[in-house]
């Protein structure tokens, strides 16, 4: 079977949108599954729907990478967006043609090509997703390195070369999953300007002529298909082999923080994508929306659902009690206190149900349960406290979620091992709670406590919550009642009592 390239694609009879040649307007640090299923997908749509006429040059940010494979396929790859949308199964295929090539800067020729792109009149945008560990300042990096080992070091080299070539400033879009990603990246570049003794003109160029934007990315990307049988079936169906085939969920939102005038610079509004990719002066409410609704829903229902006998997220969405509990928590307790358009938040919450119901992804509850102490504190506790502050009463489902958290960490504790705290659920099987060691030691020490004693010990542990939760009126009494309900009647019955 021939591997995908433009000639092979033409022979296969593919009749979707393809753009073979266009100016290279984007330099992208990162060539992995996520960026190719997300950023390059949006630019591909912009080419089709807005006649943007641009290509992305990818750069592998570390020595081992996909440059050779991507170049053998002339930048082409197949993307499947799979999931559930408005309750219906979706399985959409698209061949992405927004990528021109991929450079390996760890080879001398690849480094030279990266610098040639840096000095190009066509270049407008630099995008990055170099993982959470990518935006770091490494003082060992030098200007003359080929290349600098850190991503901010490479970016400083690229920008300095562009500055020396007398080219206009660029728009920098950071996608790394850290707080203030754009600001942190700019901070690192300024550190290299100091360390390398670069001139004040370049400092002005970076800080005034270039625009560093943070962004929030939201799409689950499982990546390649691992089932050899399905891969073989798709190759027969496509008429070509594609080792770069990528899979993402249907849902996708890219929130870029910056001056809204950038909506006129970027091609996405013109392409009719403004509900999916947009610029806002402050993305913190959107981050709050994602953390409180999407992540908060997970932590809010998963622990009790696991105790009730469920193992994957999708099955929970098919149970009327768990689904009803999750929706009540989101729509009655979380959404109303968010500082965003309420209808927009309700649509986001409805999309969460579709995402959790994805027929192509088996998302295990136990994988979500990792570090649930810090997760409940970051994702659920702010909604809980804000609800109490606004309404002067306890939110029913969020209050229950705290009891479910304690139940999960204390259900028939067997032993504390190197791997975690071994407990047992009503279904009969053992499970291992994973969290910081001190948290697990705490629950192991309190495994023989009665319910009121355990609840009081957990709620007064300020290392866990940053405060004494017994000071929230009625919370301790409600948690004792809820935990007793879970232990005596089961988590599903306890969830049902909230409806």
Kindly give the residue locations of the regions a language model identified:
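Substrate/ligand-engaging "lid" and interaction regions
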Residues: 1-499
């Amino acid at each position: 079977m021939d591997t995908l390239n433009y000639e092979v694609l033409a022979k296969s009879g593919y009749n979707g949108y393809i753009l073979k040649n266009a100016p290279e307007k984007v330099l992208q640090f990162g060539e992995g599954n996520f960026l190719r299923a997300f950023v390059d997908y949006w630019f591909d749509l912009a080419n089709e729907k807005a006649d943007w006429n641009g290509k992305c040059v990818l750069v592998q940010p570390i020595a081992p990478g996909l440059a050779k494979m991507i170049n053998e396929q002339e930048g082409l790859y197949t993307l499947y967006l799979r999931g559930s949308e408005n309750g219906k199964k979706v399985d959409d295929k698209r061949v992405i043609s927004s990528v021109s090539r991929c450079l390996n800067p760890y080879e001398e020729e690849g480094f030279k090509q990266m610098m040639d792109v840096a000095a190009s009149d066509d270049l407008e945008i630099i995008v990055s997703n170099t993982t959470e560990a990518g935006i770091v300042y490494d003082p060992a990096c030098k200007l003359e390195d080929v290349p600098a080992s850190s991503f901010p070091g490479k970016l400083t080299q690229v920008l300095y070369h562009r500055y020396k070539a007398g080219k206009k400033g660029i728009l920098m879009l950071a996608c790394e999953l850290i707080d203030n990603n754009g600001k942190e990246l700019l901070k690192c570049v300024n550190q290299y300007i100091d360390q390398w003794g670069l001139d004040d003109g370049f400092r002005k160029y970076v800080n005034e002529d270039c625009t560093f934007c943070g962004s929030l990315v939201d799409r689950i990307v499982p990546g390649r298909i691992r089932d050899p049988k399905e891969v073989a079936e798709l190759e027969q169906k496509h008429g070509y082999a594609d080792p770069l085939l990528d899979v993402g969920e249907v849902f996708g939102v890219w929130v870029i923080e910056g001056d809204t005038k950038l909506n006129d610079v970027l091609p996405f509004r013109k392409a009719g994508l403004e509900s999916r990719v947009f610029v806002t002066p402050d993305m913190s409410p959107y981050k709050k929306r994602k953390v409180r609704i999407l992540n908060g829903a997970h932590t809010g229902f998963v622990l009790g659902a696991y105790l009730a006998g469920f193992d994957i997220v999708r099955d929970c969405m098919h149970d009327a009690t768990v689904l009803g509990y999750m929706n009540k928590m989101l729509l009655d307790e979380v959404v109303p206190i968010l500082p965003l358009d309420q209808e927009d938040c309700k649509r986001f919450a409805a999309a969460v149900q579709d995402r959790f119901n994805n027929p192509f992804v088996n998302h295990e509850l136990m994988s979500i349960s990792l570090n649930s102490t810090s997760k409940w504190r970051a994702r659920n506790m702010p909604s809980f406290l804000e609800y109490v502050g606004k309404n002067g009463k306890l939110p029913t489902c969020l209050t229950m979620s705290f009891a479910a958290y304690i139940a999960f960490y204390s259900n028939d504790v067997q032993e504390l091992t190197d791997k975690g705290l071994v407990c047992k659920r009503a279904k009969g099987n053992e499970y291992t709670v994973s969290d910081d060691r001190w948290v697990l030691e705490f629950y192991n020490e309190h495994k023989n406590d009665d319910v009121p004693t355990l609840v009081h010990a957990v709620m007064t542990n300020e290392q866990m919550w940053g405060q004494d939760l017994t000071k929230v009126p009625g919370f301790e009494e409600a948690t004792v009642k809820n935990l007793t309900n879970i232990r005596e009647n089961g988590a599903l019955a306890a969830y049902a009592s909230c409806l």
